[in-house]
Amino acid sequence: KVIEYDRFQPEFYEDTKTYISKRTSTKKVQKGLNFYNDNKSLIKNVEKKFDIEKELLLSLMGIETNYGTYVGKMDILSSLSTLSFDERRSEFFTNELLILLKLIDNEKIDYKTLYGSWAGAFGFFQFMPSTIKHYAIDFNKDKDINLKDPEDAYASAANYLKKIGWKKN
């Protein structure tokens, strides 16, 4: 199944209008407003600390996981293992698998929670293991980086954008 999903990614065969229309709706906008209203303090704190627009972060979260309501059901260890043996992008996925195994071994992430996309992405913003390693943060200071928690996930996404050079308009 993983290889099948990899071969037929909608980003590569749908035109922009079709792709966007399938991923936007009045219902999704309402879900975004609900997330914003439920997390105003977090959103304002993150925007101030990282200087990243809330509109950008909320849009990304909406597209990636419908505001955390769909984070994927695939075992990402299995997905990355499978993809690492596929010759098309073996080096990339092998590297991601090795990073994930190190994160588990160093107890940075709990292997029992590793369900996400077919491609090995995880959490509310669908971070790949290398992104987790370099940019995920424990924003709520509970000694656990949990990318399925609004505080850690939202702040980690802002941290990622800031560190790769995103500049606020």
Predicted feature residues:
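Catalytic glycan-binding domains that act on GlcNAc-containing polysaccharides
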Residues: 1-169
